Amino acid sequence: MSRLTCRRGGAVRAAWMILIGLSSVLPSSPRPATGADVAAGLRADVVATGIPRPIQLALDPLGGLVVLSPGWRGDAAAEVYRLDLRGPLPVDAARAPRVVIPFADESRKTVFGSLAVDPRSGDLFLGEENGNRIYRLGADQRLQAVAVGLNHLLGGSALALDHQGRLVFLDYASPETNLRSESPLPPSLSWLIEEGYQGPLVFRIDPREERRLPRRADLLSPILPRGAAPRPAREPQWRLISVTAAAGDDLVFLSSVGEVLRLGSDGELRLVARLPAGHYHRTNLAMGPDGSVFVSGGFHIRQIFRISPAGAVSTIASELGDPGGIVLDREGALYVAETALHRIIRIAPLR
């Protein structure tokens, strides 16, 4: 067990690398993912087991699968696994290395619920679920605050990296979310929130800029809404709960009511498709190479959808065990974290 030194907003935190013997991994082939119902022409195989409640997935620059987990005991902010899927499958993650990130030494014990990986540096970006901060875990094994002062950061793909390595993250402005912020306004100033803009907020920052970190979200100018925020003459927009980067500077979002929307370079938010009605919570998005969008509906929906570039919605998998994070590899295979079953499955065309 080797210690990793990590920093959190100036305070030193400790993370632990748990190294468990990698021997005794028996050669095997991927086995069919029982219980998962996939569309015709596809198959689902189990590629990793023994991961306690995997909630987020990403690929590192070498093609390894990065998995975010809360751990078995719930006594840490997160556990991070890095799995090499080029060998015998399924991988027994109980025998794989993992990084354990402990809670901060303060009263709040917030877990990490969102993950993005810089495809160039391999740095991990970790967001607090139902929290206010985003961190970067770099190759130097230090945990550094990147953004603070959010009102309410959700889990799932509430943050993402675009094609230029800029960090995009979602927030929401309302009297209720202000109460969850790190520095809520006192009751005497609550009218500033009630009479101001209420609705989704989208921010984009470049962590590599020569500017001091962390950035304060409450002092940043959002890219949505852009310019002067609209006055509350109508009902606030639905909350944006997931984001992924599309071609160019475009971004694709999922709203809390199942709307798939696209934000173009002109600043206009356009409806792409509507998913079936349901409770969308801890959802995740992934962009296909042809411009299609994959949506993991979360543990209430238990389905994965594909939205074609033309906006047609199809279901590619259902009856999943609490689907969480999703990611596409270079060959177009879709990896899915089945949180309730403590495993990762791969959905790919039949061969």
Can you name each region flagged by the protein language model?
Residues 33-51:
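A short helix->beta-strand "capping" segment at the edge of beta-propeller domains
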Residues 42, 93-107, 148-151, 210-234, ...:
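Surface-exposed loop and turn segments in beta-propeller and other repeat-based domains
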Residues 50, 67-76, 118, 125-130, ...:
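Conserved beta-strand positions in repeat-built beta-propeller and related beta-rich domains
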Residues 64, 122-123, 142, 166, ...:
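Generic structural signal for coil-to-beta-strand starts
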Residues 77-82, 133-136, 200-203, 259-261, ...:
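A short loop-to-beta-strand structural motif that recurs across blades of beta-propeller domains
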Residues 84-89, 137-142, 206-210, 263-268, ...:
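Short loop/turn segments that connect beta-strands within beta-propeller blades
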Residues 323-351:
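Blade-level signature of beta-propeller repeat domains, shared across WD40, Kelch, NHL, RCC1
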